[in-house]
Amino acid sequence: MRPIRYLLLTLSCLLPLALSAQRTRPDILVQIYVKGLRTDLLDSYRAGWGGNGLNGVMKQGTVAPDIRYPYPLLDEVARLASLSAGAMPEIHGVYQAERYDAVTQRSESTFANRDYRGINSTEQLAPAGALRSELLTDVLRGSSQGDAIVYAIASRANDAIAVAGHDAEGAIWIDKHSGWWATTNFYGGLPALALKANNEQRMLGGRTTPTVWKPLSKSTKEGSFAHTFEGAWRMSDLLTSPFANDAITDLSKEFIRYAHKARRTSPTLIVMVLDLEVGARGVAYADYSPEQQDAYARLNEQVHQITALLQELYGADHYALNIVGVPVANLAQPKAPSRRSVVTFDPAKCIALANLYLSAIYGRNDWVMAYSHQTLHLNKKEIADKKVDMQDMSNNLATFVSEMEGVIGAIPAYQLQRGLSQPAWAKPLYSHSYRSYAGDVLLALAPFAEVAGEKPGVEQQRQRHVTAPFILMAPGVASQRLTEPISYDAVAPSLAYLLCVPQPMSADGTPLFILFNQK
């Protein structure tokens, strides 16, 4: 009898644990990447927001203060692809939003593809040839044999494609010239809901977009402002205003309603990419400016709209919401008074002097063709025709440009590709070295260096580390605030675990099981 009693006692102790370990797969996951969302600013602004929106999500779910990467990623498109794939750029292939084409000698989208055409867009884009890895979107569509509803919606084409992958039903973005919802025929046609929104003028700049940006709150403690959208900067300023996020939120809500009516047996995944880097005429508004505070307040309202709709349609135990902060710096930074000396790196001067130096060694020629994204591009055709040692020239070029104003150091790309010993300043350049079009010699610029002809302050802002949160609210996910950053490669596996699908093939990380420890 005693062994039986011990067995029954053990089972009675384990039963609550077994029940607490049970979790329900959500019918829908809405994943919101928020470019420019910072943990410090979020914690500062949300004190006066009340219990709905982001405060409600953070209270009910798990919050991590930051996302850790093995080396710095200075481009938000590379971050989006890395988070979605669970792998770094040398695996998934997307290291920055733009690449330099040595043939045409100009920069173009990293997803540029002449085999496809844009719909409501002049851009010819596709993930094919650029994105080499499987994303969470691809896994969900594949494991459901095409039954799952999967869409990605963003304000920029690169962002939408970077999170949609190859097999999403659609990647939808805002055309930067017209404001219309656009896509590429790689995904087929423009989804009917986006087409309907265009026809009803429910796109950026349409009848639903305000003509003046005023504070959402009537309280004047943050400061009052009124910005109009007109003239040559109209669409550009709209894209860097909170109204672009409003348009994405409104269209995403239509896809959520569509998914609920469709009642598929597989879970739905709607991926949104919002942007908090607000500005006007290409210049960002400063931290704690009334405009930035209003953008955060509007994000809170957008999250509230999404959660309220999910609660209404699906109920608390049948939906999941994931919010991921992504550092970004695309707009020129506002000028601030400072006593520090700012040095200027001049790419044109660098190329001219480098060609004189290399011509003295290898014969007169334009050996250096161009500069882009802290990278010098060599004339590979001339190097091959003249039978010059490419590595020898790269080494000489790196040694020479290291002495130029505004440059901390320079390193040939092949040294990074081979994993050779490298100084600490070269780490941010690591992800730039894995493509044939990525260039030949990579430059690390001084912290306060400005690049002649480029937006002031952008490079410095990209190199500055900021904390970006990870938030997950879902059935079976614990309500907790973590004190340590999570690894980037745990995001996709954790969401795959939540949806009960395999994690992306290139993802080596494991799910964050601490998320699912109910108490």
Model-assigned labels for residue ranges:
Residues 351-391, 457-499, 513-519:
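Substrate-binding rim/cap in mid-to-C-terminal beta-strand-loop elements of soluble/periplasmic
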Residues 87-266, 275-282, 403-406:
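His/Asp/Glu-rich, glycine-adjacent segments
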Residues 64-84, 151-160, 273-275, 325, ...:
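Short, solvent-exposed turn/loop segments enriched in Gly/Ser/Thr/Pro and often Arg
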Residues 26-39, 57, 83, 140, ...:
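Beta-strand elements within well-structured catalytic alpha/beta cores of enzymes
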Residues 42-92, 149-151:
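Short, structured active-site-proximal loop/turn typified by the sulfatase FGly-forming signature C/S-X-P-X-R
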Residues 34, 49, 65, 73-75, ...:
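Secreted, luminal/periplasmic, and some membrane-associated catalytic domains
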Residues 8-16:
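Bacterial N-terminal signal peptides
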Residues 49, 238-264, 277-319:
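A long, amphipathic alpha-helix that forms part
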